[in-house]
Amino acid sequence: MRSFLSRFRQPTWLATLCFLMVTALLSACQKEDTTDYTERDEALITAYIKDNNLTGFQRQPSGLYVAITQPGTGANAQTGQAVSALYTGQTFDGKVFDSSSNNNNTPISFVLGQGQVIAGWDQGFALLNKGSKAILLIPSELAYKGASPSSSIPAHAVLRFDVEVTNIK
């Protein structure tokens, strides 16, 4: 009596087994990063504030930290308004990755609340008015999350932005 497997040609059976193993390995390698970075980001931000002797920060429910270093005038920016701002962005190790000074101090302009900028900017600039200056400490979930938009910004990076609102329309 022949065994069940002997009914199949061995090379076909072996090829099928190899195919299934390779498929399983490839799908395991493509798993999405589901790590929650909230606690890590919170610890990094609070340590950064302490280590750099920074004061005046208000933590927002989203985890964004905002310190208004110079008050402006008028009403805060509202969703749908065009905001113009000067800025410098850096990682927590002090490396500047972008700045409006790289563009002859030409302010960046965006429509608030439309997703044209990272979520930390949409939330942070809604707390600012014309002429105000602030420091935004942005957790990775409100920045680029698991993406690395450039070699200067690693995935899951917590970011600092020094910003100045030059106009609101």
Regions found by a protein language model. Name each.
Residues 2-169:
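Cross-family detector of peptidyl-prolyl cis-trans isomerase
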